[in-house]
Design a protein with these regions (language model features):
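Extracytoplasmic/periplasmic copper-protein system
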Residues: 135-157
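Sec-dependent N-terminal signal peptides
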Residues: 3-13
Length: 157
């Protein structure tokens, strides 16, 4: 009986929350061909080393309550970068704001950790040289799905 109870306790605690792992590459050597055939140099976040960064960057998806771990590698051309989790309620050490959290130097990597607090749509972006980096493409979407499985994040509005 004790074994069955322990087994059920472990299963129930494992079902409640899960972990989302994300791998992002920060790059400044991307290219984007526009409608008239011109090629633009773009910055951005890529899902792997073999692709140019898409604009916007890769989607980060998690469920409310999940532990999210972002492994961010900076392979840019001598630039520092961060990942600011815009609108998410995360601790200061993982917020990606220069001089308040940490920068990821060229050819280095850093881990960002947070528990997905509230369902909704959010944005991540580099917070070093914010204007230039955002205009060049260093941003991407975040979707935190409601823990109850519904398709809405609030009622009555």
């Amino acid at each position: 009986m004790k074994t069955v109870f322990l087994f059920l306790l472990i299963i129930i605690s494992a079902v409640g929350h899960s972990q989302t792992n994300v791998f992002l590459i920060g790059r400044t050597l991307g290219e984007k061909v526009i409608a008239n055939g011109d090629t633009l140099r773009v910055f951005g976040f890529a899902p792997n080393l073999g692709t140019h960064p898409p604009i916007p960057g890769p989607l980060i998806e998690a469920n409310q309550g999940d532990s999210v771990h972002i492994d961010f590698w900076n392979v840019s051309q001598l630039h520092r970068h961060t990942i600011h989790l815009h609108g998410l309620d995360v601790n200061q050490a993982n917020d990606g704001v220069p001089m308040l959290s940490f920068d990821v130097d060229h050819m280095d990597h850093g881990w960002y950790h947070f528990k997905a607090p509230h369902a909704g749509t959010y944005l991540y972006h580099c917070h070093v040289g914010s204007t230039l980096h955002l205009q060049a493409g260093m941003y991407g979407p975040i979707i935190i799905r409601p823990s109850d499985g519904s398709n809405t994040t609030w009622d009555g509005g």
